[in-house]
Amino acid sequence: AFELFLANGVAATTIEEICEHADVANRTFFNHFATRQDMIRALAERRLVNLHDVVFDRADKAIPARLVGVFDDIAAALVGSGDTYREMIGEMLTISGYGIQRGSNLHDTFVELVKEGVARGEVSERHDAETLADIIVGALSGGIVNWTGDRTYSLETNLHNLGVALAELLTTSV
């Protein structure tokens, strides 16, 4: 389905085309996904699984620098992916609730990162990890949503600036 969405666009791709491409009957599709939105939500969750590895493959870097680097890498990957991918990401974010819910893979990745930073003495303890992860995920998804809806929004510049601001928030003490 992901390849079809990229080739044809999200709105133009039908469930029938997805079933034909996957060589499954419509009934089989609906046994797995109650709605088209459920399928897109599942695609979004699969795409986010790799983010955990991206974040934690940088174990040699301090947590604040790692956060900036991850935001930079996400921006570079998305900007280089083309307009159809931009549409697909926007649709995935909208349907998946922007991935900001506590307990989502995206949120849990950043909770783990913050806790690691606290344990290493690189992140301030003045706010709990869940709250800081809420802010990080909100900033990331907000930047991406702005990019999907505004062709003039510089994702690379703005995600970098968001990453830097978040790094300062994580380390600044009162």
Regions found by a protein language model. Give the residues of each.
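Short hydrophobic clusters on alpha-helical segments that form packing/core surfaces
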Residues: A1-F5, L140
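Helix-turn-helix DNA-binding elements, focusing on the entry/boundary residues of the two helices
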Residues: L4, I15, N26, R36
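Append "Primarily bacterial transcriptional regulators
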Residues: F5, E17-H21, F29
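An amphipathic alpha-helix adjacent to DNA-recognition modules
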Residues: A11-A12, E20-D23, H32-F56, D60, ...
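Amphipathic, non-transmembrane alpha-helical scaffold segments
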Residues: I40, A44, L48, S96-H107, ...
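Hydrophobic alpha-helical connector segments
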Residues: A42, D53-D83, L132-I136, L159
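Short secondary-structure transition hinges
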Residues: A76-E112
